[in-house]
Design a protein with these regions (language model features):
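Short coil-to-beta-strand
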Residues: 157-165
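Solvent-exposed, acidic/flexible segments
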Residues: 93, 128, 159, 174-182
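Basic/polar, cationic surfaces and motifs that engage anionic cell-wall
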Residues: 19, 25, 46-74, 172-243
């Protein structure tokens, strides 16, 4: 009888041990399932988040500049006087990108901003006075070229040595361009991309070089910047289909 009671106790202990073991297994399995579901969810979110970028990159990679011919927009050449502050005359030998800026001078036109660059020639040879741009686009969409494309401009910091710079006028502090300014910018950038076979990903904002809020509207509204680059791609593809 004592032996039977001992056997019963042993069985109960074994049963409790098995229950605890089963409970641990179930807990581990539950945690593993939850982790797996979380990983799958994160994967789906990541794919959804980056797929537009992949699509955009694919569109860019499809461009064949040998089949594209973008006509030169109407440009008024009003080159700056050579000087140490705004037109040093340093050769720009390898053009790999285009940098978009805004003037940060609301309501002014292309001529006024060009003349501001010109006025730097009378300033001391100091860093604070070194400023210019290859092109300025006015509120009315007119384009003034201040510096030849084969010379550097003092506009984009460390990217001065390999990029073309474009300053855009804007009517107010928001930095948003007028429709005419925007259309001229799309045309000019498309023309430069075609001429120098520049990838769309190398059409950048001043912000992308220095983190400066320039061009303000495109920095504050990155979706508008993406749309702008898409408009360039669309413009180039349209010209490709016309050839």
């Amino acid at each position: 009888m004592f032996r039977k009671q001992a056997d019963d106790k042993t069985m109960k202990k074994l049963t409790r041990a098995k229950k605890r073991q089963l409970k641990r297994v179930l807990i581990i399995a539950g945690v593993a399932s939850a982790v797996s579901l979380l990983v799958i969810l994160i994967f789906i979110l990541v794919i959804r988040g980056i797929s537009p970028k992949f699509t955009e990159q694919a569109k860019e990679d499809e461009l064949d500049y040998t089949l594209i011919k973008v006509g030169k927009p109407l440009i008024s050449e009003k080159f700056l006087t050579k000087n140490v502050n705004s037109r040093p005359g340093t050769p720009l030998e390898n053009i790999t990108g285009v940098v978009v800026h805004y003037t940060a001078n609301p309501g002014t036109d292309a001529k006024a901003n060009r003349n501001y660059f010109e006025s730097r020639k009378d300033c001391p040879d100091e860093g604070q006075y070194k400023v210019s741009s290859h092109f300025v686009i006015g509120l009315d969409g007119s384009i003034i070229q201040c510096i030849p494309e084969n010379e550097i401009a003092y506009a984009s910091n460390k990217r001065n040595s390999d990029t073309i710079s474009i300053e855009c006028c804007h009517p107010d502090d928001s930095g948003r361009f007028t429709e005419k300014t925007y259309h001229s910018l799309v045309h000019l950038v498309s023309y430069l991309c075609d001429k120098y076979e520049i990838p769309i990903k190398q059409v950048i904002r001043h912000y992308d070089v220095t983190q400066k809020e320039c061009p303000r509207y495109f920095v504050k509204h990155p979706e508008s910047w993406r749309k702008f680059r898409e408009d360039i791609t669309t413009y180039l593809k349209k010209k490709e289909s016309e050839e």
